[in-house]
């Protein structure tokens, strides 16, 4: 990649494919996934100074325990603030981690605009965490499509609208084929009408 790094959002994801005990045994690190995610975010730190967030999705949570943990910050030094909130990382000991550094081109400078965004559900197959870099030109059309379909969107922000669009198709697919969601089909349907630049 020869392009100069500019001020843009950064997205990082870690997916551990083996049991968590394997990484502790091999590397001697209790929370290997979180340490890798932090390293990826620190390496991209120049890309986002307006906000930061980290989420850990537990693929097999015990009943009665949350399926994910998330911290976000819009403090003066957001990544350092997020890492302080994470502390020893015990709650973030997980197989799937998602991080984001925000460079605000639109929207407010506030924690509600910081990714990862979450679409809540008590059904694990319908829960969605999203982080990305969005500059969509079809926000108005997406917003109007939501209104016409009986939804009540709480924001015009492109990230929010995209989260709700993906969640709509995910819910529909999960209802049609419970436990056997075709995620590539869900994303294809949700992203098809988009125009602009984005990274998920």
Give residue ranges: language-model regions:
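Conserved short alpha-helical segments that host acidic/polar catalytic motifs at enzyme active sites
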Residues: 1-200
